[in-house]
Amino acid sequence: HLLQFNKMIKEETGKNAIPFYAFYGCYCGWGGSGKPKDATDRCCFEHDCCYGKLTNCNTKWDIYSYSLKDGYITCGKGTWCEKEVCECDKCLRRNLRTYKYGYMFYL
């Protein structure tokens, strides 16, 4: 779910997803093309690919449960789609801290 994804990003980076990540690099936000600009943009690319594989799921609106303990995200119980969407969303842990302000609103 997009609101849960925003919450995960804020918990991990301290940044709100909309102003900081919605228009970052080539792949963060809606759509994307070209070569990812850095590890943060690559994470967004991987996230898009992960969602793309879940063709029978409502990736942007499936509500899932997760917990955050000692810096680790654990996806909770739910339907197969809910668990898979959570797994896609938690990929952000790896690279979002490499954020560079120069790639905000990148064209």
From Swiss-Prot:
Catalytic activity annotation: a 1,2-diacyl-sn-glycero-3-phosphocholine + H2O = a 1-acyl-sn-glycero-3-phosphocholine + a fatty acid + H(+)
GO CC terms of this entry: extracellular region
Gene3D superfamilies: Phospholipase A2 domain
Compartments reported by the entry: Secreted
Entry EC no(s): 3.1.1.4
Keyword Transcription belongs to the record: no
Cystine crosslinks: C28-C44, C43-C91, C50-C88, C57-C81, C75-C86
Domain of life according to the entry: Eukaryota
Active-site positions on this chain: H47, D89
Top-level enzyme category: hydrolase
UniProt binding sites for Ca(2+): Y27, G29, G31, D48
GO biological process: arachidonate secretion; lipid catabolic process; negative regulation of T cell proliferation; phospholipid metabolic process
Chief place where the protein resides: secreted
Expressing tissues: Expressed by the venom gland.
InterPro entries in the cross-refs: PLipase_A2, PLipase_A2_dom, PLipase_A2_dom_sf, PLipase_A2_His_AS
Family designation: Belongs to the phospholipase A2 family. Group II subfamily. D49 sub-subfamily.
The protein's assembly and partners: Heterodimer of A and B chains; non-covalently linked. The acidic protein (B chain) has phospholipase A2 activity and the A chain weakly inhibits the B chain enzymatic activity but potentiates its lethal potency.
Name assigned to this protein: Basic phospholipase A2 sphenotoxin subunit B
